[in-house]
């Protein structure tokens, strides 16, 4: 089972919070102190909380649950996509569109349009159009791919959200709360931990820290999924590789 040690976290700078003047007092229980006007996160709290979150992600994945990775800030964009793809899960790494979860019906229509445009771009339909029309459609395709490409095969609401930066992704968290979808989130010293089921106090800006969280989460999900496949193989539902 994937776990992350105190040493891993120190090396990735997980303990560096935000400047003290930007703090959210609700994060006080997770703060060790301050150094040079920057809050230091108490990793003795973070290590067990993160490892508990990994165990839970593993369980959800072993029950065939769908995990949606969310991170739209610059330091997370690439890492979120890589992590989700590495464990066959889903992601949103560009702007979170309001209603992405709470208005799933409408989102499903847009996904259908995205898939239609994808086939048109591959089956030669674009070549038969006027230059202007082809350009308009490929622009629409690009836009839809950017916002929905990571969830186009999700086939319904996710069973959990794994969020980088609770403050930045507060709309996604609120939608998940409204629908009773559990939220795992990296919560920095400037963020509000309310509404988060699995709080992971940590630096949400440093690329190394972001990669550490995502790699560990993806590994936990992969291991959970392989348990599920192993069980199915035992029951003769799938062929073991």
Curated annotation (Swiss-Prot):
Domain of life according to the entry: Bacteria
Q: Which residues cross the membrane?
A: none
Which range is the signal sequence, renumbered to this chain? none
A Pfam family annotated for this chain is: Ribosomal_S2
Gene Ontology BP annotations: translation
Q: Which InterPro entries does the entry mention?
A: Ribosomal_uS2, Ribosomal_uS2_bac/mit/plastid, Ribosomal_uS2_CS, Ribosomal_uS2_flav_dom_sf
Q: Which GO terms describe its cellular component?
A: cytosolic small ribosomal subunit
Q: Which UniProt keywords apply?
A: Ribonucleoprotein, Ribosomal protein
Q: Does the keyword Protease apply?
A: no
Q: Report a single Gene Ontology molecular function.
A: structural constituent of ribosome
Q: Which family does it belong to?
A: Belongs to the universal ribosomal protein uS2 family.
Protein name, UniProt field: Small ribosomal subunit protein uS2
Q: Which organism is it from?
A: Proteus mirabilis (strain HI4320)
Gene coding for it: rpsB
